[in-house]
Amino acid sequence: MWGRRAAALLVVLACVLTPVPVAAAEAPVAHIDFGGLSRTYQVHVPPGTPKGLVLSLHAGGQTGAQQAALTNFDPVADQHGYVVVYPDGIDFSWADGRGASVPDRTGVDDVGFLVTLVQRLSADFGIPPGRVFVTGLSAGGFMANRLACERADVFAAIATVGASLGTNVGCHPSRPVSVLTIHGTLDPIVPIGGGPMMGRGGASTVLAATALVDSWRHLDACDADPLIEPQPGVDAQFVERVSYRCAEGSAVVYMRVDGGGHTWPGAPEILPANQVGPAIRSFSASEAAAVFFDEHGR
């Protein structure tokens, strides 16, 4: 498995996205009523029979459509056979448990909404059990971690960028969940070393990237010795991939990007570089996530 994963990783590192495209034909907005609210989302369907479903969660202040454009995940999903759903958060954010967003403070049940959404789409598209995944940037990544903590029965793996978990958020998954976390050392929004941070919705305190990895290693009953793979970088950046084998075929993988900012690897900065740090151009996070999901379904 690890030999195949290493070969697949070379494909990831060779695939670097171009700047965010303007969608030629944006998917129509769909609606679902949940918790007394009309929630919106967009769906991308690959050609052929889908192999899985990816829930892609936007950053704070963004929308599902902007997440689709930023990550350019649709063509990657077509290659890997994934239906992708891009939901919209209330007040452009998520109830990720930190208490630092409008959805959190007003009691929005985003866990329930997102689980209901993927269960409906799984039924609509015949998605096999164990082939539902989550990826997210920033606040979307925080929400992905919360989903893994609370609904490991639904989500087999997550892949996050520039995100962690609030120190006040309990994590008690019912079974192992594979986790890929990507973090830049020059991220000025979500500090790689953890501690206090100020987001769009207010202040919170978050786990350091290494503490998040250690937490998932413990929860997933991982081996003590990791596989460490330095990767080539660009723009004076250096990427180190640290992988742990874990229970029930799961894995915990940490990609630290020395010199990287609060950006989706393979895409431009979502805000000016002086606000979010340097773009990461040495690999595609979308391709990395898809390969990780390919390998870590149930």
Give residue ranges: language-model regions.
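A domain-start/cap signature at the N-terminus of enzymes
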Residues: 2-5, 19-53, 79, 83, ...
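C-terminal catalytic histidine-bearing segment of alpha/beta-hydrolase fold enzymes
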Residues: 182, 207, 217-298
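Alpha/beta-hydrolase fold active-site loops
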Residues: 51-54, 177-178, 252
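Serine-hydrolase catalytic machinery in alpha/beta-hydrolase-like enzymes
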Residues: 27-45, 49-133, 143-146, 150, ...
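Acidic catalytic loop of the alpha/beta-hydrolase fold
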Residues: 187-190, 262-264
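Active-site rim elements
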Residues: 101-105, 195-205, 272-280
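Short beta-strand/loop motif that positions the catalytic acidic residue
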Residues: 181-183, 187
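Bacterial N-terminal signal peptides
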Residues: 9-18
